């Protein structure tokens, strides 16, 4: 994705906007969601803004997608005994509001009406 305005996630990665970082390496950053829908709600975000959604990421860089999933698993292992939901919203009608691919790691009881079981 190439735009003149960086996404909010790119601004977090650049440390222009504060966030609670729970994991980071050279390829991804994981932050606490600012409006959590479950006791554990972490966003895992690739540091590249090249991909708008998970289907673009899977086609363009499957190794980065695998790394993102492995990072999600590590977070779930540390915070939720390894049990978690991994959610990618793809498209505005599906609830995607930031068009910089990211995964939601959710664990524990979800807020009512958040997701189908």
Where are these regions (language model features)?
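HIT superfamily nucleotide-processing domains
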Residues: 1-117
């Amino acid at each position: 994705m190439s735009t003149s305005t960086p996404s909010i996630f790119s601004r977090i990665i650049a440390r222009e906007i504060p966030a609670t970082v729970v994991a980071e390496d050279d390829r991804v950053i994981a932050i606490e969601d600012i409006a959590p829908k479950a006791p554990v709600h972490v966003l895992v975000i690739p540091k590249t803004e090249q991909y708008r959604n998970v289907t673009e990421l899977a086609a363009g860089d499957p190794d980065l997608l695998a790394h993102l999933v492995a990072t999600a698993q590590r977070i779930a292992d540390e915070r939720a005994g390894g049990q978690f939901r991994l959610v990618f919203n793809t498209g505005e009608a599906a609830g995607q509001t930031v068009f910089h691919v990211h995964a939601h790691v959710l664990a524990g009881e979800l807020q009512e009406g958040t997701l189908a079981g």
